[in-house]
């Protein structure tokens, strides 16, 4: 029964379908990173568990202008602790360091990064321990991005 478990007020009760869209676990800080889709768009950190075993206090994650129109998914690179921020409307994946500064980006536009056509509605992103990036998109599309292997010759 859900009533047996604590609830968490994440705020933005009036956001409708523009509330929290993305969620990622940050093992280094033992916190959840949450992404608010838009109006206003935002990134937040929620320590979990807090000192008393409950969720801590949600804090805004400091970042500059992301250059994105929305946030559709988040992932944390376990190797670096960097955040991967996916925007379906901007057709972009942005890497932020732990201070919120952009490190790199991956355009999801057709004609770039091996894509014949752009990824129109990217909805989810994750990364494995080797740095391969996996993106799911509507309708039922799956993409894998891997760094090119050096030529052995």
Where in the sequence are the language-model features?
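Sequence/structural signature of beta-propeller domains
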Residues: 1-153
């Amino acid at each position: 029964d859900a009533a047996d478990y604590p609830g968490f007020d994440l705020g933005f009760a009036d956001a409708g379908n523009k509330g929290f869209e993305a969620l990622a676990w940050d093992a280094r800080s033992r916190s959840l990173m949450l992404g608010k889709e838009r109006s206003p768009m935002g990134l937040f950190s929620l320590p979990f568990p807090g000192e008393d075993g409950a969720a801590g206090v949600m804090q805004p994650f400091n970042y500059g202008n992301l250059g994105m129109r929305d946030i559709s998914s988040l992932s944390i690179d376990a190797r670096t602790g960097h955040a991967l921020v996916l925007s379906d409307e901007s057709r972009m994946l942005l890497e932020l360091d732990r201070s919120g500064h952009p490190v790199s980006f991956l355009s999801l536009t057709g004609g770039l990064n091996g894509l014949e056509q752009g990824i129109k509605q990217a909805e989810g992103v994750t990364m494995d321990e080797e740095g391969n990036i996996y993106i799911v998109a509507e309708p039922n599309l799956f993409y894998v991005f891997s760094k090119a292997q050096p030529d052995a010759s």
